[in-house]
Amino acid sequence: EKKAARRRALIGEALALVGLSDRAGSLVGTLSGGMRQRLSLACALVHEPELLLLDEPTVGVDPELRRGFWEHFRALNRRGGTIVVASHVMDEADRCDRLALIRRGRVLAVGTGAEIRARAGVPDLEAAFLALAGSPGGEARQ
C-alpha cells in the first residue's frame, strides 16, 4: 500500500514535470512525437536513477518546460545522481558542469564551458566548437 502510494506520487510528479499531467490516462498511441519524448523522460525519472543518460533532452520543448527540466536535473545531481547529456545545442551543453566536445568521434576538448571558451579564445561555446574543430574537413587546430 505504502509502496503503491509512493509509486503513484512519483508518476504524478514526473508527468507534471514534463507537462503531461492532463494526459495521464491517455494511450501512448494518441500522443504526439514531442509528447512521447517527454513521456520517455518521465518514465526514466519515476525510477529515481543514479545515472541518467539523456539525448537532446529539451529539443522541441518550450522554454518554461526546459527550465523545469534543468531545475530537476540539477536537483537530481545535488542528490548524488549523475547525468550525461548528448546534445548538438551548445546553449544546452553549456548548462552542464563538464563538457566533452566531440566531432566525428574525436574529442576536441574537455572541461567546463568557461575553460573550453577560454582555451578557444572566444566568448561562446558554439564559436569554441567551431574554432576547435578547425577546418570544414574536421582537423582540429593545434
Regions found by a protein language model. Give the residues of each.
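Conserved ABC ATPase signature
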Residues: 27-31
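Hydrophobic anchor residue at the start of the ABC signature
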Residues: 41, 69
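Conserved ABC ATPase "signature" region
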Residues: 3-23
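Catalytic Walker B motif of ABC-type/P-loop ATPase nucleotide-binding domains
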Residues: 52-55
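Conserved catalytic motifs of ABC-family nucleotide-binding domains
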Residues: 48
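ABC ATPase "signature
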Residues: 110-111
